[in-house]
């Protein structure tokens, strides 16, 4: 089983496991520059590895320089290129520690509202994403990041009908335009931004149809049978399931979890 963590302001692992909580990337960068941040990131992930954690849902690639934005405190807090430089430097640190990293929240939060509590519409033009939001993701992918997490934002210039996590168009952008060949994972399907699009509980089916390889959810008892039924009916092609499983198994092999 893959285990997960979150770091800094993303903290999910119990603080009691560590002598002190890990500060956010912004705080570490302000205190010790990029070198200090990378050193602490390596140390933290080595501890996670010792605890049996093999996937860390970080780093945050979202570009935000406005403290009033929802995502700001969780972001690097710098412009697109500085954030991209951080991402390209930190991805190899995760690899060095033996803990896989997850670039998030594709295609970028910007100044959007919190999708934990409702729908977030992003009306910015695609040129803004090209010049800003996508740059850190491109940097992380080029550095070899094995996972990308897709947000629930509705990005109108990419797909105005569905949240990014449920959008085949957004996943095609990630695969074909950005050239990502690793594992795509959803943001939490229990978040309110998704519920309006899957009121019958079919979020996992929609997510797999969109192109996600892994699902973040707590509603397994309902969603697993729905996915199985969708495969049996042909609503989800078995060849697609095979492709998703292959990518997950490839990453498990890279982490030394299977031979």
Which sequence ranges carry the predicted segments?
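A short C-terminal boundary segment appended to hydrolase-like catalytic domains
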Residues: 249, 253-259
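A charged helix-plus-loop insertion that forms the helical arch/lid used to bind
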Residues: 19-32, 77
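Second-shell residues forming the walls of enzyme active-site clefts
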Residues: 78, 85-232, 237-240, 247-250
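Glycine-rich anion/phosphate-binding loops
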Residues: 30-46, 80-85, 129-130
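Acidic-leg catalytic submotif of subtilisin-like serine proteases
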Residues: 43-56
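Active-site-proximal loop/short-helix segments
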Residues: 14-22, 54-73, 100, 104-121, ...
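Single conserved hydrophobic/aromatic residue that forms the stacking wall/gate
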Residues: 1-12
């Amino acid at each position: 089983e893959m285990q997960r963590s979150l770091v800094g302001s993303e903290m999910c692992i119990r603080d009691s496991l560590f002598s002190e909580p890990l500060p956010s990337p912004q705080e570490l960068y302000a205190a010790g520059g990029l070198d200090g941040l990378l050193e602490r990131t390596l140390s933290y992930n080595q501890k996670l590895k010792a605890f049996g954690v093999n996937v860390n849902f970080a780093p945050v690639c979202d570009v935000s320089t406005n403290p009033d934005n929802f995502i700001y405190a969780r972001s690097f807090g710098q412009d697109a290129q500085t954030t991209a430089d951080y991402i390209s430097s930190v991805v190899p640190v995760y690899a060095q520690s033996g803990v896989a990293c997850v670039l998030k929240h594709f295609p970028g939060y910007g100044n959007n509202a919190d999708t934990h509590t409702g729908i977030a519409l992003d009306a910015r033009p695609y040129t803004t994403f090209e010049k800003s939001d996508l740059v850190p993701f491109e940097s992380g992918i080029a550095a070899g990041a094995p996972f990308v997490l897709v947000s629930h934002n509705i990005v109108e210039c990419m797909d105005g009908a569905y949240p990014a996590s449920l959008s085949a168009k957004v996943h095609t952008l990630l695969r074909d335009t950005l050239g990502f060949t690793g594992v795509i994972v959803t943001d939490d399907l229990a978040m309110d931004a998704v519920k309006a699009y899957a009121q019958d509980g079919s979020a996992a089916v929609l997510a797999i149809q969109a192109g996600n390889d892994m699902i973040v959810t707590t509603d397994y008892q309902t969603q697993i049978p729905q996915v199985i039924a969708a495969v049996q009916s042909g609503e989800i092609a078995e060849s697609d399931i095979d492709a998703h499983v292959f990518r997950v198994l490839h990453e498990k092999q890279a982490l030394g979890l299977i031979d």
